[in-house]
Amino acid sequence: GLGGGGEWLALAEGVAAVIDFPAVQETAPMARFWELVCDARIEKVLHAGRQDLELFAHHAGRLPKPFFDTQIAAAMVGYGAQTAYANLVQRVQGVKLDKAHTFTNWSQRPLSREQLIYALDDVTFLLPVHQHLRQKLSVMGRSEWADEEFARLEVSLGAQARDPQERYQRIR
C-alpha cells in the first residue's frame, strides 16, 4: 500500500520491493517506475486502493490502468464489504499476518528492519489472493461485475483528480 513514507509493492509473483518515495520520487529511476505503473499491459493489484491510485495518478500524471482492487472483488464473492487485507489473507491463504506495525511512524527515517519486513510481508500474499478472487469471480459469473466496479472507481477518481496535498488542505 501507499502511505506516508515507505511504500511497498509486489512487482511480480515472487518479487517484492520497498521504495522510499520521499527519497527518490523526483529522480530519473522513478520515471521508469511510473512508466511501469501506467503500462496498460500490466494489471495493477491493490487492496482498498483508492488512495494509492490517487497518489499514483498525481505522481505519474495519469491514472494507472488496468487495476484490480482485492477489497472490491472480495465483497463480490462473499467475503463481506470492506474486508481488511489481513482478514482476507487469513481467509484465503490461511495465514495470520503480523499487523504490529500498522500504526508505526512511517515518516521516520531510516525505516527499521521490522518496518521493512512488515512492508514486504504485507504484499507477499497480494497476487495469490488476486488469483483466488479472479477465479471465484469467474466461477460465480461475476467477473464483469468486478470490471464494472473498477471502471466506476476509475471514473470517480478521474472526476476528482487533483493534487492530494491540496485535497488534504481542504479538509475542515
Roles of regions detected by a PLM:
Residues 1-87:
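Conserved RNase H-like, two-metal-ion catalytic cores of nucleic-acid enzymes
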Residues 14-16, 63, 92, 101, ...:
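Residue-level signal for pocket-adjacent positions within structured domains
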Residues 55, 87-91, 125-128, 132:
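Alpha-helical scaffold segments in soluble metabolic enzymes
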Residues 60-62, 99, 159-164:
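Short, compositionally biased low-complexity segments
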Residues 61, 75-81, 93, 97, ...:
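Hydrophobic/aromatic-lined pockets within catalytic cores
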Residues 68-73, 100-108, 138-149:
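Short, surface-exposed recognition loops or helix-turn segments adjacent to catalytic cores
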Residues 87-114:
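A short, charged helix-loop
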Residues 113-172:
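Mixed-charge, glycine-rich, non-catalytic linkers/tails in nucleic-acid processing enzymes
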